[in-house]
Amino acid sequence: IDHSNPDLSAMTFLTMEPLEGVACLRRSVQVTPDTRRGTVEGTASYQLQNTTGQEQTVALGVTPGYTISNVRANGVEVPFSVSDYQEYNEAKLEVAIPAEEQVELTLEYGGFPQESMPTMQGSKELSGEYLCLENAALSPRLMNVMPGEDGYPATIEITLPAAMTVIPFCASEAEVVAEHGDGTKTWRYETNRAGGILYAGDYVREEIQAGGLTIDFYYGRKHQAVMEAAGAAEA
């Protein structure tokens, strides 16, 4: 059940004041969806620079369907809290980071992704045929930490059934970096943003030539016979 503020003009999270003297230099995510149960488990790491000489409270947007655990700064457990207030299917996770200049913030998360409008086109789904993880559903999203000089460079890894292909909604392509004995593969891609969108599915890929360009055209394998009969790749 979605408990987000019904006022769609609310922007409490979007208008948070950024912390002065705190920046994110890099982040990484390792996420493993369970396509049979419809759940997600993941770990996230944020390389933060704190030049204030004081403890700071970092805010992240989290999916309310997830449980947050094992929150650490430079390997030491730190206090955290998750707000009851929700906005656009996000709750606010607040974490106290130490006064040290270089801080590696790590955390674990897991549970059921939720969404505010399940009937909208392109809505989130998590199955062996298709999944879409957006922003906080993919990993907790920094809300009050500004990017470093290089932006928000991020490495995303996701482990899925071998039949699924990963398509990130960004400029880079995902590549397989490991194949496991349990019939899964780990994909990796680089991006540069605080959030992100990831699609994956049991896809068939066709190359289409158009205007001197080669375009990758993907469609679900269950539609392969229909698409081939219709000559979709030649259309």
How would you describe each model-predicted region?
Residues 25-33, 89-94, 138-143, 170-173:
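Short structured motifs
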Residues 43-64:
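Ligand-binding face of N-terminal immunoglobulin V-set domains in extracellular IgSF glycoproteins
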Residues 61-66, 150-152:
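Short coil-to-beta strand junction motifs in C2/discoidin
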